[in-house]
Amino acid sequence: VDVSAELAVAVAAAEAAGTLLRREPAWISAKGAGGDLSTDLDLRSEELIVSRVRAAYPDDRIVAEESGAAGAEGDRVWFVDPLDGTNNLAIGLPVYAVGIAFCVAARPVAGVVHDPVSGGTWSAVRGAGARGPGLPAEVTPSARPPLLAWTQGHGLAADPATGALRTAVEARSGRLLQLWAPLVAWIMLARGRIDGMVGYRAELVDFPAGALIAAEAGVEIHRFDGRPFDLRVDLPESERNFVACRAGQFARIWPSGG
């Protein structure tokens, strides 16, 4: 399936949203009861992206971080994270990104991640590889303990199982990064800046764009039991658990095999 037109729309929308995020001040408000935040920039960025996608593909379904799902059920679905790393931006930490994924029959076929801070844009089409600054990555094996990133779903901070799993992963790592911006972590992994990424009940909206780019850049995504992770957007949250790393590195990160 030729998705070059959809990819072009996603790239242009993500970069336009990045310009907005980089130049405009943010008004911050609480989001839910778990200490999460939202800003007016989340909403404005999302409105910009959704309007562009809707103008180009009025019949497609769009699932966006702030506004949820809109449009008729169908095989063509867009996932929009207008500001991944809101809490970071709110405290002045320049670690955030924009992510857009286009999916057909529940599988991501095109993905874009834009970093407003560096101005870098990364993209991928399923089966055609990934493009962007630092790609393809030159990754050489290292004997040092792996540098890993961790991501978890919302509302799990007080969950004992989550804490135990995170502690176990950290014990196997040289350093465990919790960036609160999974899209940034996916790009770091795709570029070989980190050795792996572990996700537990990962959030859906920011998942497909980053995972597709990393996979097309040569990253292997495993289930906790070591089997290949089926990169689909219709999996329940309880099954969005993964270990992403380069070939042959799974046992270093997850030596128990599950």
What are these regions (language model features)?
Residues 1-8, 12, 160, 164-170, ...:
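Oxyanion/phosphate-interacting regions
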Residues 59-61, 175, 195, 220:
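Residue-level detector of anion-binding/catalytic polar loops
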Residues 72-131:
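DPxDG-like acidic metal-binding loop motif
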Residues 129-132, 136-137, 157, 249-253:
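Short helix-loop capping/hinge motifs at secondary-structure junctions, enriched
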